[in-house]
Amino acid sequence: MSNKQAVLKLISKRWISTVQRADFKLNSEALHSNATVFSMIQPTGCFHLGNYLGATRVWTDLCELKQPGQELIFGVADLHAITVPKPDGEMFRKFRHEAVASILAVGVDPEKASVIYQSAIPQHSELHWLLSTLASMGLLNRMTQWKSKSNIKQSTNGDYLVNDSDVGKVRLGLFSYPVLQAADILLYKSTHVPVGDDQSQHLELTRHLAEKFNKMYKKNFFPKPVTMLAQTKKVLSLSTPEKKMSKSDPNHDSVIFLNDEPKAIQKKIRKALTDSISDRFYYDPVERPGVSNLINIVSGIQRKSIEDVVEDVSRFNNYRDFKDYVSEVIIEELKGPRTEFEKYINEPTYLHSVVESGMRKAREKAAKNLADIHKIMGF
């Protein structure tokens, strides 16, 4: 077995014991007494349903459970966002603003959690450089996100078909994205990181870099952060349920936003791609991806198992009734966040004060931890 194969096998083995799937509703046993929770989301404007169910509702649950001695840091990953170029500065600034409004709208309490802009805390970038001296090209090449964002072709079984020409076109920032993500997490000595399924591979790399640093400098400095996966499976596009819901989808009817009006939500769900296999509604992501996506959405919102939702919708025998039920569930869930978003988006001074307060606390911790890292490394 080569050294590279041994490292990859070790990472995979340890990953199993450092991932926890969040319950439908977190309880006080989810975190230990001095836990530090860290998570960020890219600024793409007002959050959509996938952002909400796949990430930020867990943040809200954690705020409700926070105990003295625990720390929550949630942020806007604006440095990560520019790994895909954002040439319109004014629009990007607007998206950053809307991201903060969305974080508060879903229920994150700024009295319990620090809300930050990644770019405003320079220690993120410096630790990125320090960790990049430990990260091998082989491990980074194994990451899938740079391949998906570079539109690398995939085989029928989902493997990426990478050639030298493809690699030569990849921007360095996108390729090293996972190292910056590791720096974001380790800078605060985070113990728990809520992420979606598509980010779990990056948390493997984060733990690997933490262990490598600790072993190299013979210090137990960085904890191995636990991956907290949301209970809801990935929310998919309403029109193309083979890919995840995304604001960049050219078909706006594919995405449900927090600030969508009830009539818009109902229209989008009625137009959602389903099938003609049966007028009985059951969960089968391969044969019935559209129907399964709608069942998954209801499961996430209601915090019920897929099996329970399938039983609930068994009373419907036509698509209109089924889809109207899904619409009602979504409309009711987003009623509060929609109202709160409209309130916060019109309070820029308050949003600025929330971020400034959060960054003051985060900068203090970031500065202390980076100073300790400098001392360990001999700077």
Swiss-Prot record:
Instruction: Return one Gene Ontology term, BP aspect.
Output: mitochondrial tryptophanyl-tRNA aminoacylation
Q: What InterPro entries does the record tag this protein with?
A: aa-tRNA-synth_I_CS, aa-tRNA-synth_Ic, Rossmann-like_a/b/a_fold, Trp-tRNA-ligase, Trp-tRNA_synthetase
Q: Kindly list the positions annotated as binding ATP.
A: Q42, H48, L49, G50, N51, G196, D197, D198, V235, K244, M245, S246, K247, S248
GO MF, one term, reads: ATP binding
GO CC entries: mitochondrial matrix; mitochondrion
Name the PROSITE patterns on file.
AA_TRNA_LIGASE_I
Reactions catalysed, as given in the entry: tRNA(Trp) + L-tryptophan + ATP = L-tryptophyl-tRNA(Trp) + AMP + diphosphate + H(+)
Please indicate which superkingdom the organism of origin belongs to. Eukaryota
Its localization reads:
Mitochondrion matrix
- The protein's predominant localisation is mitochondrion
Pfam families documented for this protein: tRNA-synt_1b (PF00579)
Among SUPFAM superfamilies, the record links this protein to: Nucleotidylyl transferase
Q: What keyword terms does UniProt attach to this protein?
A: Aminoacyl-tRNA synthetase, ATP-binding, Ligase, Mitochondrion, Nucleotide-binding, Protein biosynthesis
Sequence motif: 'HIGH' region, positions: 43-51
Which residues does the record give as L-tryptophan binding sites?
D184
Q: Any idea of its EC number?
A: 6.1.1.2
Kindly state the positions of the motif 'KMSKS' region in this protein.
Answer: 244-248
- Coiled-coil spans in chain: none
Q: Function, please?
A: Mitochondrial aminoacyl-tRNA synthetase that catalyzes the attachment of tryptophan to tRNA(Trp).
Question: Which family does the UniProt entry place this protein in?
Answer: Belongs to the class-I aminoacyl-tRNA synthetase family.
Q: How does it assemble?
A: Homodimer.
Kindly give any further remark recorded in the entry. Answer: Present with 672 molecules/cell in log phase SD medium.
Mind telling me what this protein is named?
Tryptophan--tRNA ligase, mitochondrial
Instruction: State the taxonomy lineage.
Output: Eukaryota, Fungi, Dikarya, Ascomycota, Saccharomycotina
